[in-house]
């Protein structure tokens, strides 16, 4: 594992950031609340936190050096069939010949069908080394997305999905470049 990470790090500078598309998914839910808060010294922090029933959804997207691309939200866990559908219907229409699609080693990402879908679009597929979220700049974008979702505290699926769309529009190109730079690609 350490050797694979070292090899990836050594070859990062050979990858053209303008051609890279990082793909990943993250969970979002209707019970998201701020993790921290402030109150006056000696006063307890009082905040509403949902208990009981909530709904979990999966958000998947791609990150380019200048934008988030091909966002997709579903109300169930990711599996191989759903991921292939995402690739065919959302990601592939955004790909250009010569793009390099990079993803982690999730089992739903590693089928031969996934490779065929990507390569048929004229793009190349690369997998990150195992246990290497630090090489995936979309993880930083997801951290920002989740911080905004916790602050918004949406409690219904339609409101949650609308909020995700609004937050995605607030990701400027320079911030996407900073995510790439922080992960070592610029």
Regions picked out by a protein language model, each given a short descriptive name:
Residues 1-186:
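Short functional hotspots at interaction and active-site rims
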């Amino acid at each position: 594992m350490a050797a694979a990470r070292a090899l990836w790090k050594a070859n990062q500078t050979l990858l053209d950031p303008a051609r890279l598309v990082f793909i990943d998914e993250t969970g979002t839910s209707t019970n998201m609340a701020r993790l921290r808060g402030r109150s006056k010294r000696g006063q307890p922090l009082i905040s509403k936190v949902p208990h009981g029933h909530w709904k979990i959804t999966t958000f998947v997207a791609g990150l380019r050096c200048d934008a988030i691309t091909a966002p997709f939200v579903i109300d169930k866990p990711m599996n191989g069939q759903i991921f292939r559908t995402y690739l065919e219907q959302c990601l592939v229409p955004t790909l250009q010949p010569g793009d390099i699609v990079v993803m982690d080693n999730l089992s739903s990402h590693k089928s031969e069908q996934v490779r065929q879908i990507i390569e048929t679009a004229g793009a190349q597929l690369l997998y990150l080394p195992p246990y290497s979220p630090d090489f995936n700049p979309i993880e930083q974008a997801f951290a920002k997305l989740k911080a905004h979702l916790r602050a918004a505290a949406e409690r219904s699926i339609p409101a949650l999905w609308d909020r995700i769309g609004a937050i995605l529009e607030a990701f400027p190109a320079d911030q996407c470049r900073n995510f790439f730079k922080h992960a070592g690609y610029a």
